[in-house]
Amino acid sequence: MTLKTALTREDILDLAAYEKIREQRRGEIVAAKKLRRVAVGPYATFYFESFDTMWYQVQEMLRIEKGGEAQLTDELEAYNPLIPKGKELVATVMFEIDNPDIRTAFLAGLGGVEDRMMIKINGEQVIAKSEQDVDRTNAAGKASSVQFVHFNFSTD
């Protein structure tokens, strides 16, 4: 089996076909995401992405927004970078704090966090590289509550 590292137009179902399988696929994706979720501390959760999780995200965005082919191009451009390419893990990192005052204060002190994440597996320490689509820390030093990071492992 070949590892799929990018979504194409051919992978995406039209809205009518997607509606027929949506509930089944949703259940499968929810179950898979539970196994790909790692809580780190009281507020941070890493959601490790895959071809399937990004396929589902694109399908759901198209379903909700109904933007047609123009939207599909944008969604593929936005989500393809989050599909792992070989020897890497890609994570969506979410800082989840219900209280807006605590969340604002917490994120204000977290600027640059996207450059300080790492993962250690079998003694190998891999520093995260943030997705470069937009700055995830603003000029005032406040971090975004959602970060996208890549962990690129060596070929050894």
Describe the residue ranges of each PLM region.
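Residue-level signal for secondary-structure boundary elements
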Residues: K34-R37, K66, A70, M118
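Short, flexible active-site loop motifs that bind/organize anionic cofactors or intermediates
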Residues: T8, A44, F148
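Short, extreme N-terminal leader segments that mark the start of a protein/domain
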Residues: M1-A31, L35-R37
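A broad, low-specificity signal for short, low-complexity segments enriched in glycine/proline
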Residues: L3-R9, A16-A17, S50-V58, A78-P81, ...
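Long, hydrophobic N-terminal alpha-helical segment
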Residues: R22-F48, W55, M61-R63
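Long, charge-patterned amphipathic alpha-helical coiled-coil/hairpin "stalk" segments used as oligomerization
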Residues: Y79-D156
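A glycine-rich, hydrophobic loop/mini-helix early in the fold
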Residues: F48-V90
